[in-house]
Amino acid sequence: MFIVAVLMLAFLIFVHELGHFIIARICGVKVEVFSIGFGKKLWFFKLFGTQFALSLIPLGGYVKLKGMDKEENEENKINQANDSYAQKSPFQKLWILFGGAFFNFLFAVLVYFFLALSGEKVLLPVIGGLEKNALEAGLLKGDRILSINHQKIASFREIREIVARSQGELILEIERNNQILEKRLTPKIVAVISESNDPNEIIKYKIIGIKPDMQKMGVVSYSVFQAFEKALSRFKEGVVLIVDSLRRLIMGSASVKELSGVIGIVGALSHANSVSMLLLFGAFLSINLGILNLLPIPALDGAQMLGVVFKNIFHIALPTPIQNALWLVGVGFLVFVMFLGLFNDITRLL
């Protein structure tokens, strides 16, 4: 599974660079180089004017667009060609830069969609344990929840989702001994301190006091529309989780010791015990890769998009030497974060 995990990570990088490549070609920009990895090219071939390469350091990838690295030199003849990045509109430039993250997001949604369409292994909505408020509402161990507020329930996960966004009293339709019963209860709000142990960071959530029966598993199939809805819901959950983790890291409420590097990521991927688990983790990692690339850090897509906005909308452009210096700072920062993650991975193994 370790080799499969490494290949999955390489594939996600390929998906990201493929996004830049395809959007650039749609916008009429010539792609000079498409590389998986950085540094010395180990193997390459040329096709339709593009050099496709596999490079020495497999910790990323890049596409080299015609005219992109010489965009500041307005007199350069290469910039006057119609297939040059420099000649494209601000919208096209932003679309090309966003293309990598867009393909990462698209890959994740498609994985979630096809897994839901093919049948998802889930915990059935059968009660395995109860707390006081659930008992007082008349619920019993072994009850199967059919619907909440007239919304059909197929898995225990859906119960949590509906309860989380509910308002006021809930109407539960349950099956008990082949009879359909209706029960009513109001969720209670529980407040806990986050994992950071910061007393100022309180997490509140709603519960109805039931636990699943871990032995009751089943496969739920969805229609095309339902599968698409599930895919978007899972994608949204992934985005919220990643953005919140970044926020906590930036605000200092999460420790940098929580960062993982390549070893940790590959290790987590290699623990997937089925193809569906590997794909689910790969989809989440793909969302992560897309969001991280949109951060406004020099050398990442987000900073380049910010540069396009400032130059073409606010008419503010930094001199090339300053841009190059910022790029080096950005690369240095990313290398530092990478080695910090690697250090954390090794520390966990010791």
From Swiss-Prot:
CDD domains: cpPDZ_EcRseP-like, S2P-M50_PDZ_RseP-like. Keywords: Cell inner membrane, Cell membrane, Hydrolase, Membrane, Metal-binding, Metalloprotease, Protease, Transmembrane, Transmembrane helix, Zinc. Its main location: membrane. InterPro entries: PDZ_sf (IPR036034), Pept_M50_Zn (IPR004387), Peptidase_M50 (IPR008915). Zn(2+) binds at H16, H20. One of its GO terms (biological process) is proteolysis. Its cofactor is Zn(2+). Its EC number is 3.4.24.-. This is Putative zinc metalloprotease jhp_0242.
